[in-house]
Design a protein with these regions (language model features):
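Conserved GNAT-fold acetyl-CoA-binding loop/helix
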Residues: 26-46
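A short beta-loop-alpha structural element at the N-terminal edge
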Residues: 5-20
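Conserved beta-strand-loop-alpha-helix junction that forms the acyl-donor binding cleft
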Residues: 88, 111-122, 136-144
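Conserved acetyl-CoA-binding loop-helix of GNAT-fold acetyltransferases
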Residues: 83, 89-102, 121-126
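A short helix-loop-beta-strand connector motif used in the catalytic cores of GNAT acetyltransferases and
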Residues: 46-56, 65
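Conserved beta-strand in the GNAT
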Residues: 62-71, 77-82
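Hydrophobic adenine-recognition pocket in adenosine-nucleotide-binding enzymes
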Residues: 10, 81-83, 114
Length: 153
């Protein structure tokens, strides 16, 4: 299948660019929640960035996004899934998410956390994720893979 994007393994040298991407991609949600602080967003990303489980999304050889899968005993967490706002709204996010889930599929369910009210919720619901529970901090909502019943932590 021809696709307009590709993936390459992330490296430690990608960290600064990725921190800036997160700040750009997350700004609307963080502003809406009254939590926008560019320096904090960068630090939070850099504090949790692990290149070994992260792929850079490229279009025409240029980096436009990132996605990571963190494996735990009972679930695989989709993390740091950000696309440059300039390439959002083209269906690329759905394609990438399905591709990455297929590549990592095993017996564990996929999970992810999003900010309450995030526009990204539509993307995840299109792919089949369902709301499981709110994490109690008033911001994050936890979503599970298709067919997973709502639960509590």
């Amino acid at each position: 299948m021809d696709r307009p994007w590709g993936l390459r393994p992330a490296t430690p040298t990608d960290a600064d660019w990725l921190a800036d991407l997160k700040a750009r991609a997350m700004r609307p949600d963080l502003e809406r929640l009254g939590l926008w602080d560019r320096d904090w967003a960068r630090r939070r990303f850099l504090d949790t960035y692990v290149s070994t489980n992260t792929d850079i999304i490229e279009i025409d050889g240029k980096p436009v996004g990132v996605i990571a899968v963190r494996a735990e005993v009972d679930a695989q967490w989709i993390e740091h899934f950000y696309l440059d706002p300039a390439v959002q709204g083209r269906g690329i996010g759905s394609q990438i998410l399905r591709h990455v889930m297929d590549a990592h599929r095993d017996t564990r369910p996929f999970r992810l956390a999003i900010d309450r009210g995030s526009a990204a919720r539509r993307l995840y619901e299109r792919v089949g994720f369902v709301h499981l529970y709110d994490d109690g901090n008033g911001v994050d909502q936890i979503f599970g893979a298709p067919g997973e019943p709502p639960t509590q932590p």
